C-alpha cells in the first residue's frame, strides 16, 4: 500500500489527465444510470466496508502510528483515526444515501406558455467533482456515495497522512461499483502522495473537472479558493458561536455549550466562542465556565469572564477570530442580543451559530439576522453535518452564497436544465 512521495512531473501530468478522462467518460454513464443500479452499488459498498473492517483498521493503524511519530496533535489524530464504530457509521451513511430519493431527472418546475409550449426544469448531475481532503478518511466514503447517488463521477485526493486508510476504503467502493456493473472510474483515488497532484486538479485538467470541494484546514481551503480555475464549494473557517440569551434555561445552556465545544473539539461544527448575555451572567456565567474547565476545556475570557472563575486566562483580540480545533474556547459577556449579533458578524466565519433561549422573539431575530449557512435555536452547533440533516452524509459544508450553502448533499450536487416540449411553434 505504499505510494511514491513524488512522481516525475511528466508522468504525474499524464496520470492525472488519464484519471480525469476516464472520470469524464464514467460521468456520462452515471448520468443515465437508473436509480436501482446506483442503489445496488451503494449497498455493495456498505457491505464491503463492514466485511473489510479488519483490513481498514490495520491500514489506519499504520497511518495513525506514522502521524503520532511525526508529532501530530491529538485533534489531528482524532480526525484521522478509525474504529469499529466509525466504520459502521461510514457504512450506515451509505445505507442512508441509498434510501434517499434520486435527484437526477426530478422535475422541479413545469409550466405552459401562452403559445402552448411546456417548459420543465429538471435536475441533472454536475459532471465530475474533485474532492481534496486532508486527514479524515471517512470523507472518501461520504463523497463517493453522494457523487454516485447524484450521478457524478468523483476524483478524490486524500492527505498523505491518510493514504493507506483511503486505499483500503477505496477498494471497498470499487468492489461495490463492480458488483453493480458501473464503471470503476466513477470513484477514483489519486494513487500518489505527490502534492503536485493538487495543483493539477485545481487547474481543472482542461475542462474535465466541473467543481472542486476542499475538506481540510485553512491553508488548504485558502489555496483552493485562490488557485482553482473551476467553481469551488468550501468554507474557510468554522469559527462558530453559542449565544446564551437572558431567557435561556441554565440546564439547557450547560448541555448545549458542553456538547457544542467538547463532543469533538476538532471538527468544523465545534463552537469556538461563547457569548453570554449580561442579564444572564449573574446566574449562568460561573456554572457555564466552571463546567467547561472541569471538562478539560481552556477558557479564554474577557474581564467579566475572568472574574467568574480564577482559572480563566485572558482572551486576546486574535482569539475572537480563531478556529481553535482544540478544547479551547473564547468567552465574552455581551450587552444583549444586538451586541451578540454584531460580534458574530465581525468575527464569525458564516458557518454555524446558535442561540440558547426560551424567548421566541429573540430566537427569530437571531435566526433571521445572523448571516451564517446554518443557524440554530436551542441545539448544538455540532449538528452542522449532512448526516444530521438527513442527507445521509455530506461532501462538505459551503459558506458561499452561490449554488450550494450549508451541508452539500445529493441535491446540491446537481444543477438543472430546461426541457421544452412544443408542437411546431416558431418565434414570430
From Swiss-Prot:
It comes from the Bacteria. Its main location: cytoplasm. GO terms for cellular component: cytoplasm. The keyword Amino-acid biosynthesis applies. Keywords: Amino-acid biosynthesis, Cytoplasm, NADP, Oxidoreductase, Proline biosynthesis. Belongs to the gamma-glutamyl phosphate reductase family. Pfam families: Aldedh. Transmembrane segments: none annotated. It catalyses: L-glutamate 5-semialdehyde + phosphate + NADP(+) = L-glutamyl 5-phosphate + NADPH + H(+). The keyword Transcription regulation does not apply. GO terms for biological process: L-proline biosynthetic process. GO terms for molecular function: glutamate-5-semialdehyde dehydrogenase activity; NADP binding. Its EC number is 1.2.1.41. PROSITE patterns: PROA. It is found in: Cytoplasm. This is Gamma-glutamyl phosphate reductase.
Amino acid at each position: 500500500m505504499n505510494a511514491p512521495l513524488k512522481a516525475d512531473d511528466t508522468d504525474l501530468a499524464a496520470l492525472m489527465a488519464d484519471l480525469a478522462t476516464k472520470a469524464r467518460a464514467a460521468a456520462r454513464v452515471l448520468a443515465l444510470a437508473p436509480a436501482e443500479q446506483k442503489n445496488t452499488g451503494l449497498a455493495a459498498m456498505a457491505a464491503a466496508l463492514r466485511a473489510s473492517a479488519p483490513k481498514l483498521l490495520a491500514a489506519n493503524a499504520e497511518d495513525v502510528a506514522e502521524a503520532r511519530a511525526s508529532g501530530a496533535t491529538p485533534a489531528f489524530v482524532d480526525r484521522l483515526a478509525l474504529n469499529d464504530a466509525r466504520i459502521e457509521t461510514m457504512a450506515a451513511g451509505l445505507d442512508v444515501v441509498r434510501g434517499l430519493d434520486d435527484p437526477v431527472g426530478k422535475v422541479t418546475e413545469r409550466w405552459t406558455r401562452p403559445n402552448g409550449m411546456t417548459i420543465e426544469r429538471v435536475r441533472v448531475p454536475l459532471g465530475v467533482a474533485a474532492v481534496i481532503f486532508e486527514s479524515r478518511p471517512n470523507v472518501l466514503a461520504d463523497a463517493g456515495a453522494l457523487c454516485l447517488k447524484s450521478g457524478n463521477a468523483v476524483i478524490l485526493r486524500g492527505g498523505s497522512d491518510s493514504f493507506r486508510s483511503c486505499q483500503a476504503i477505496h477498494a471497498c467502493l470499487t468492489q461495490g461499483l463492480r458488483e453493480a456493473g458501473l464503471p470503476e472510474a466513477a470513484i477514483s483515488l489519486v494513487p500518489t502522495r505527490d502534492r503536485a497532484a493538487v495543483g493539477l486538479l485545481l487547474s481543472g485538467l482542461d475542462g474535465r473537472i466541473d467543481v472542486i470541494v476542499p475538506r481540510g484546514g485553512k491553508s488548504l481551503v485558502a489555496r483552493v479558493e485562490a488557485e482553482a480555475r473551476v467553481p469551488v464549494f468550501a468554507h474557510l473557517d468554522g469559527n462558530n458561536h453559542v449565544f446564551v440569551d437572558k431567557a435561556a434555561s441554565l440546564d439547557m445552556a450547560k448541555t448545549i455549550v458542553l456538547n457544542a465545544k467538547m463532543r469533538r473539539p476538532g471538527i468544523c461544527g465545534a463552537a469556538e466562542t461563547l457569548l453570554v448575555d449580561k442579564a444572564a451572567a449573574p446566574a449562568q456565567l460561573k456554572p457555564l465556565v466552571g463546567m467547561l474547565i472541569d471538562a478539560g476545556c481552556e477558557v479564554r475570557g474577557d474581564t467579566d469572564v475572568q472574574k467568574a472563575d480564577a482559572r480563566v486566562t485572558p482572551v486576546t483580540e486574535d482569539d475572537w477570530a480563531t478556529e481553535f480545533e482544540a478544547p479551547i474556547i473564547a468567552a465574552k459577556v455581551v450587552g444583549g442580543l444586538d451586541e451578540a449579533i454584531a460580534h458574530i458578524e465581525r468575527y464569525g466565519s458564516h458557518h454555524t451559530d446558535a442561540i440558547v433561549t426560551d424567548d421566541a422573539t429573540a430566537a427569530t431575530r437571531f435566526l433571521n439576522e445572523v448571516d451564517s449557512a446554518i443557524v440554530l435555536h436551542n441545539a448544538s452547533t455540532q449538528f452542522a453535518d449532512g448526516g444530521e440533516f438527513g442527507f445521509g452524509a455530506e461532501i462538505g459544508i459551503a459558506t458561499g452564497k452561490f449554488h450550494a450553502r450549508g451541508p452539500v448533499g445529493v441535491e446540491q450536487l446537481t444543477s438543472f436544465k430546461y426541457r421544452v416540449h412544443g408542437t411546431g411553434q416558431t418565434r414570430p
